[in-house]
Amino acid sequence: MSKKDSKNSPKKSKDTNSDESSSSNAETSSDKSITYLKLRDDSKTEIKYIYHMSDIHIRKLQRHDEYKEVFDRTYKILKSEITSNDSIIVLTGDIMHMKTEMSPEIIDITSNFFKTLNEIAPVILIPGNHDCNLSNKNRLDALSPIIENTYKFPDLFYLKKSGLYQFYNIVFGVTSVFEDDLVTADKITKEHWNKIKQPNKFKIALYHGPVHNAKTDVGYRMNNEQLLAEDFKGYHYVMLGDIHRFQYMNENKTIAYSGSLIQQSYGESLHGHGILKWSLVEKSSELIEVRNDYGYCTVKIIDGQMIETKIPKKPRVRFILENTNQIQYQEVINNLEKQYLIQEIVKESNLKTKYNNSSPSKKDKPTAYATQETMVNSYMEKRGLDEKTTKGIIELHKKIYQKILANNKEKVVDVMHNSTKTQKWRLLELRFSNALSYGKDNVIDFRNYDPNKIIGIFAPNHYGKSAVLDIILFCLFDKCSRGDRRDILNKNEKNMSCSILLSIGSQQYYIERIGVRNKNGLTVKIDVNFYSITTNEKGKETMTKLNGLDKNETNRKIAELIGDYNDYLTTCFSLQTKNSNFIDMTQLQKKEYLNDILKLNVFEECHNYAKDKLKDLTGQLKVLEQKIGQKSLDDFKSSVRKITEEMSVINSEIKWIGNNLLPQVDIVINKNPVVPRIYYNELLDYDLTDVKSIIRTQTNILKQLSDKQNNNEIGTISVEITSKKQQLNEISTKFDEEKIKLETQLGELRTNKENLLKKLIKIPKINSDEIETHKKTVQECEDRINIIDKVFEEHENDELTDKMSRIDELKALISRLRKSLAVTNNNDYSHLDKLYEELINVDTKYRQCISNVLNPKKILNQQEKNHLSEIVKIKRYFTDNLIDNNGLLGDYDKGKSNLNDELIEKIMSKNNQIIDQENEWFEQADEYLKQDNSGIIDVDDIIKQRSKIQEQIRKILLNILNKKENQIIESKINKAQTELDALAEFTGTKKEIDNLVQEKKLLKDKIVFLKEKISQNELAVQNQKSNDEIKKQINEIESKIDQITCIIKDNTSEINTLKQYISEKESIIKKHQKQIDQTNKLNHHYKLLDKYYLEYTNWNHKNSTREKWLKTRTEMNDKLNDLNKNLDKKQVELDMFKKEVEQYIESRKEFDDKSTEVNLYQHYVQIMNCNGLPYEMLKTYLPLIESDVNEILHSMVNFNIEFMFYDDSKLEEQKTKQLKSNMGSVDINICYHNMKPYNVQLASGFERFIIGLAIRMTLCQISLTSKPNFLIIDEGWSCLDSDNLSNVGTIMNYIKTQYEHVIIISHLDELKSQADYIISIDKVKGYSRIIENKKTIKKIINKKPNKIIEL
């Protein structure tokens, strides 16, 4: 890996030497000084063999059992190989896996590793990037504490700094990860070289980092032109670390990576891990593999059969499935679990599985971007449409597609024939002034940075790291992720500018935006310029302005060239605040976004066009449907036939009436001429208009004659008058005698009443609640006095404590009690007895009505029986309510108030009385119902009245209970409030004590006053009882007075009735003489009426017969006219139907044609729906996306993902997984071994970030839109823990292969150490400023040899 610049001087490091040399501490004083240190030398001993190991990666807690087994085998190999003192062990870094996190276990296993190796042979050790925090070189590395403080390692030499180190016949040129200067072979001077006396002496370079063209474990070639294998020229051997793959870097095989001792991931091969043995004298080397029973292995399962693969005893297995279902896959796992102790399982499906190929014999692998025209045809066939419809839809699609393509050439890509406009543009230069927190003249020239490198932007908080991203977005799209557009201008400046130089192929473009703050300071005017830059043969550049008519059109042109703002946020811009992650999108957003980047939006345009066209066609079809109506051609023919038949019937009827009926009627009329009517003068006063009136007149005369003949009744009337007068005299005489006695008795009673009224005592209005209130107030005053006494007692004993906690408790108690108060009213309940009396009276009436109904002599009909049953139900409902009320009253806590207790007992007693009466009635009613006996009575009014009274009683009782409960609660509130007031007012001072003394005195006075009031009220209560007794006597007297008054009134009424009867009879006798005269006259009129009746009957018969036939003739003429009119109307209808038939035939043909077209468009709209053909096409891309995403994930994590979508062939697999598919959705599941897949929405922060990053990179790769050459990640790594952070190097190495520039912004030290280049930000006078750093190892190579300091 490339290193960052360092201006710090090397720090002290302690090195351990053998007995032949002494220990030394060294410190270089100049950057140009090179340390030369003799570790051990006796001028005789020669080192002939070096056992080279690297990249151990001991983890904090994981895989320790595996490491111990491998270490034990390593020790055995080394002990068998090393039998003399001519061998050493070299460790080239990355002993630890996590540089900043340690544990007791990792210290134990590491120190034991060093100790055992040191006992076998001398050890030369250099640090790796995983052993130290390179972003903060002042921090202690992870190895020093173990080497210096755990054990004494006499033969372990930790070469932490760059320099030259002599060990017997070897000079090691160490280039440390802490420094950037490459220690080349020419740094070893002849003077030092000649001092080595051994005949075989060697220059060996030790370096931990990537060398150009080194191949990583995942197959990626390192692009690090700053450090080539040729730069180690002059060394006999170069021993490298950092790359986990064993490989030689030159043809002579003198430069090599030993690879990782233990396999680290699935990307590494199962074999090729161990110790690289260098034979220095023989100039050869060989890899001694160390067996590992664990290991990562990849197994393919094709057509349900596992391809033979070498598997260790305790493997971590990654399965790649081809044409294999879940059942077959599970069978393979079950078989392997019987043979091996599987540690981990990762499942991955390749493209063949996604496309459901039947066997691997199908070599034609489906491409991601197949011709969509073929898919249109196959989708039609899949929907089961007939050949004619399919052909019509395909022709319609071609027509619509060509029209969409012609109208929207700039917006829609020709995906039908794979004519895409995909292009990749390169960011060359960014310039900006006074943008956000920055000042003037800031430049980032990306042409200065080598491709496939990590560019880090590092600075303290609030320096503007993330602002660089917003400036790039603003310059490209005229918008940024934070704030408003006007906020892009620095708040302290009046103008700003930013520009981007980019290229597409050889063509360069220049985008410039200039902002000026308006005079009011509230708005900012921003202009945009867009240029293309061409270079002629002489190298002269020419800028051509590409601006549109206005700013919006210019922005559209830029977007057409480089793409959409939202696409960039989802692919190459990972922002800190608005991280538009694909997995966070809704289902609709996912499909819309994929359609957009894959240029499937043409189908949405086709769908919208067809949908609008369908609306127009549907409207036209409705108009045609209204024209043809609901009738068919047969209906029209039937109507014509029906009208013709009706016209024939009408003609026949006209002929029959005119030719036959009318002549016969005229003959009858002529035979009945008009006859004159006869009248009598004596009868002119009577109403004789018709036969009924004549008979009625005769009847009246007979009745009058009958009344006149009652003359014999006059004598009877005279006798009755004499008898009644005698009776009147007797009653009057008797009443006169009794009246005197009664009036005397009445006077005495009135006198007694007046005397009793005088005895009544006038008392003030008494309120029982007021007495209780006074008593409660007295109790509260006494409680308050007790509290004050308690306070005095506490104060006198100097034992007062903090009252605040008690105050809080009291406040909380008061609040709870107040919330529990029920709502009541202050109505007077004295009329409760009256309500119960009214209820009893109503029940009495009710029973009387029912008793009338329950008549045993009458048999019930069904209606009467139903009515009685309804009455029983109603009465039972009210009886049940009374029982419930008694239950509530029974729950009342008695003993608190005698008045309430008496009232409740009284109410319950009356309720029980009513309930007993009702139960008796129910028994009687049941008997009558069983005997089918009933009566009919209307009791609705009584029931309503009874219900109203019971509801009033219920409300009163409920209100009484609520009031009593409220009184108890209010008492508790007052008590707590009294204590609270005392605590709140008390401060412990003398003044407050005096106030309490005064308060106590006032309270005592108040108690005396209230007790007097209570005594007065109790006396008033006694007087009230005396008054009640007197009133009772007065009521008895008034009752007797009413009885006497009633007797007098009854006798007087009887006398008046007799007098009236005598008067009426006497007037009857006076009228008797007139009756005789009237009787004679009535007899004459009656005889004359008999004669007139016969004459009138004869006249009326003749006349009515003529009128009847005249009316018949008129009716026939009218009917004849109606028939003629109806005949004309039918003729008009017949003519209209003929025209309608002609129009119908024309409209029907047009309707059928239009209906076929509408049906075609309906199918087309359904097919082009977002869940139709576009979704089917999208499913062809999803396996590719899934495969690419999993390929990225496997280099970082131990899980993979799967895209879930509806597919008939996958239903069985979905059932096995117990998952639900949705045709209209694109779901993502996370898959771990031995775990059911779960939705990514349930994933952890780390899982979501890694999956989002992998999807982001994959979408950027397959996008059919324009894409840039860079990826920007702003603070996205904070969710990684220590174990996952250790894989950052691997992740970065992979990302660099995909993008020309990877820009990272982070505060994590692990991320800072990954940067190949650093863009620093400084602040000058409150303005941020860009500072570019670009120092690499390559620059140091060509320097002159530095000064050597020998130790």
From Swiss-Prot:
Residues 1-17 have a biased composition (Basic and acidic residues). It comes from the Viruses. Residues 1-31 are annotated as: Disordered. InterPro entries: Calcineurin-like_PHP_ApaH (IPR004843), Metallo-depent_PP-like (IPR029052), P-loop_NTPase (IPR027417), Rad50/SbcC_AAA (IPR038729). One of its GO terms (molecular function) is ATP hydrolysis activity. Pfam families: AAA_23, Metallophos. Residues 19-31 have a biased composition (Low complexity). PANTHER family: ABC TRANSPORTER ABCH.3. This is Uncharacterized protein R555.
